[in-house]
Amino acid sequence: MNFDRQNLTDDTLVDLYKRILKPRLIEEKMLILIRQGKVSKWFSGIGQEAISVGVTAVLDQDEYILPMHRNLGVFTGRNIPLYRLFSQWQGKANGFTKGRDRSFHFGTQQYKIIGMISHLGPQLGIADGIALANKLKKNGKVTAVFTGEGATSEGDFHEALNIASVWELPVLFVIENNGYGLSTPTNEQYRCENLADKGIGYGMESHIVDGNNILEVYNLLSDLKASMKINPRPVLLEFKTFRMRGHEEASGTKYVPQELMDQWAIKDPVENYRKYLKANGVLTEDFDEA
């Protein structure tokens, strides 16, 4: 994996490492808790952390994000207290949904996060509405909305991108292409080689990004955010990554070829970034062990 720090300081590189490590450590704990029966379900984002972490790190704290069920890095990136998050996942009364849900179906105005909609497509249109309000206010704010490659087959995807393009709304449409929609591989979902190519039909700028490379994510998003403040517009981003766990923990990954799992395992976003920082003297052994 090729990491390009560009003009990032050592402090920024270490901060990004802390940001990407935090959701990974939480996820590893959650996998234990689900087997102990202390949580009832879990939608893992292991292997996809660089995307949500990188996007959230670039946006201002008062800019809205509309995440999915695998975007733990959005919630940790906004520094939501862990006791509130764990209360939510365990269905406790002091969780965000007061025990009515034990997953990521919640939002919080305090942290400018809009709760996910299960089939994902509809939240793209909501992002358009937020972006329209920002454009009318001329405040230079950007809105980021996450979706999966499966949801790009929904009608909501077309409607949201079409109106965003026509009205030049400042929206970052983030597609996490992780190879599978539930148990359906991408070659059974669509015929185009890259989903980013769909941007052409809307006259929309689009990019293909290595979703496992935290620096590539962060650097591109930093440039786009600065540019969109001057020239408000929508941008379609296809992040290539892979779902290393089941759709949710109970479903497993038996339908995924083992060679594909092995191929992506060596592209782990956390481990590869750690190795890069150590090799370049940015991360010391003492710091990493701590």
Language-model-detected regions and their locations in the chain:
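Cofactor-binding active-site loop characterized by glycine-rich and histidine/acidic residues
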Residues: 28, 32, 37-167, 185-191, ...
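Conserved acidic/glycine
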Residues: 1-51, 57-58, 250-290
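N-proximal short alpha-helices
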Residues: 3, 24, 96-100, 237, ...
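Glycine-rich ThDP/TPP pyrophosphate-binding loop and its adjacent helix/strand module
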Residues: 113-290
